[in-house]
Amino acid sequence: MSERKVRVRFAPSPTGALHIGGVRTALYNYLFARQHGGDLIFRIEDTDSNRFVPGAEEYIIESFKWLGINFDEGVSFGGNYGPYRQSERRDIYKKYVQVLLDSGKAYIAFDTPAELDAKRQEISNFQYDASTRMSMRNSLTLPKEEVDALIADGKQYVVRFKIEPNEDVHVHDIIRGEVVINSSILDDKVLYKSADELPTYHLANIVDDHLMEVSHVIRGEEWLPSAPLHVLLYRAFGWADTMPEFAHLPLLLKPDGNGKLSKRDGDRLGFPVFPLEWHDPKTGEVSSGYRESGYLPEAVINFLALLGWNPGNDQELMSLDELVKLFDLHRCSKAGAKFDFEKGKWFNHEYILKKSNEEVAGLFMPILKEHGIEAPMDKVVTVVGLMKDRVSFIKDLWETCKFFFVAPTEYDEKTRKKRWKEDSPERMLELADVLEALDDFSLENQEAVVMKWIEDKGYHLGNIMNAFRLTLVGEGKGPHMFDISAVLGKEETLRRIRRAVEVLK
């Protein structure tokens, strides 16, 4: 890698919710910047005013805040290379459009949409390039006086990049190696439109990356076909020596079948494709987000990092700091990565297990309050310790362990038929008497006394414990029985046993 300071950027357009593929691109830029002691820039590419969606920019910033991806400079972060919003850089772009016009590397074209459509009808596979430009209405074919007059009259025009034919354009890609494309297949791309006095993506992108001293462009594979054009633009400006290095990341693919992962795939298969819930201001449609679906941000980060990259060993669980140390663009795959949403759930489960019981309890407390439960923290911590290995999401803890906080009002019919025997009411009342006599209601003492009682009486252990579980839980699930009764306490345990006998006898 060159000696220049690493400066990378993530530059979304505020046209809607941030796709999870965009999050992965930002993550890889973040990991690369942190690993090399560089800067991560947040730029907003809002040159397409027709597609602007109110609230999208704020949504993107909030998404990264939740994920823990921090930017060093950019929109809402400040910095010395601003403004960082492209709509605020119009005068800068105009200046560089003029540089290309003055050097003969670009030209003004007046062709109307109707005229271009007519050409497409006339010539199959029509392309505005070296083979057709001299038959079109532009500053290469019209006298200068006429061009000046048309502009003075307010005639709308575009500025096109003049691409010379039959040149092999070499793009060195960190992930894909040498990519070579012949310039003859490229059209004379529009760089600027007089109608809104804004550049197109291609010009703004190159000018901004150069002026912001971006050293590496790490972006999605969908931009690979544009890379030769971008190389030619750097050369046209005389910036070839400071051109950034490119790395085009593999696509995120549908979980089933071929093609790029889309929002429709998430809707169809029941998983989010956005980091946060998104309320579309135009349609009113609400799309699910990873945060609201119960994913932990560190699990999402770890899951995404391994979609298209691997550390070279079998390690799967990695903190953000570990990812920074291990990340290597050369280990990114060229092939697309299938989006395995079940694996995402596995990561979330593993990160719940990694958290301390106190941390998980803190996340579970608001859910308990939503259900009207005011429980002491020490009880919640104990319950979480018993139950967190059974869930993939914090929100699932309620259904999994609500019996610790709310006594059953009904008893599962299937469990009742299978496990509630004819003598169960009598045995449970006996058990209640045994437990009531205990001064020490600790788990260990309960277990010792009850097991001795069962042995002394010659009762069937399974029958007693199954019936005991049904009285406390209402069904046949849950952890070790004496863990449950110890958490419930003596009074609540006795109350539940006796109530169940009343209902079930």
From Swiss-Prot:
Q: Do you know which InterPro entries this protein is assigned to?
A: aa-tRNA-synth_I_cd-bd, aa-tRNA-synth_I_codon-bd_sub2, aa-tRNA-synth_I_CS, aa_tRNA-synth_I_cd-bd_sf, Glu-tRNA-ligase_bac/mito, Glu/Gln-tRNA-synth, Glu/Gln-tRNA-synth_Ib_cat-dom, GluQ/Sye
Which GO BP terms sit in this record? glutamyl-tRNA aminoacylation
State any GO CC term. cytosol
Name the EC number(s).
6.1.1.17
Motif 'HIGH' region extends across: 12-22
Q: Name one Pfam family in it.
A: Anticodon_2
User: Can you tell me which residues bind ATP?
Assistant: K263
Q: What GO molecular function annotations does the UniProt record carry, in alphabetical order?
A: ATP binding; glutamate-tRNA ligase activity; tRNA binding; zinc ion binding
Please provide the record's keywords in A-Z order: Aminoacyl-tRNA synthetase, ATP-binding, Cytoplasm, Ligase, Nucleotide-binding, Protein biosynthesis
Localization per Swiss-Prot or TrEMBL:
Cytoplasm
Query: Motif 'KMSKS' region: residue span?
Result: 260-264
Keyword set includes ATP-binding: yes
Q: List the disulfide bonds.
A: none
Q: What reaction does this enzyme carry out catalytically?
A: tRNA(Glu) + L-glutamate + ATP = L-glutamyl-tRNA(Glu) + AMP + diphosphate
Q: What does this protein do?
A: Catalyzes the attachment of glutamate to tRNA(Glu) in a two-step reaction: glutamate is first activated by ATP to form Glu-AMP and then transferred to the acceptor end of tRNA(Glu).
Tell me the subunit arrangement: Monomer.
Can you tell me which family this protein belongs to?
Belongs to the class-I aminoacyl-tRNA synthetase family. Glutamate--tRNA ligase type 1 subfamily.
Q: What is this protein called?
A: Glutamate--tRNA ligase
Q: Which species is this record about?
A: Phocaeicola vulgatus (strain ATCC 8482 / DSM 1447 / JCM 5826 / CCUG 4940 / NBRC 14291 / NCTC 11154)
Please state the gene responsible for encoding this protein: gltX
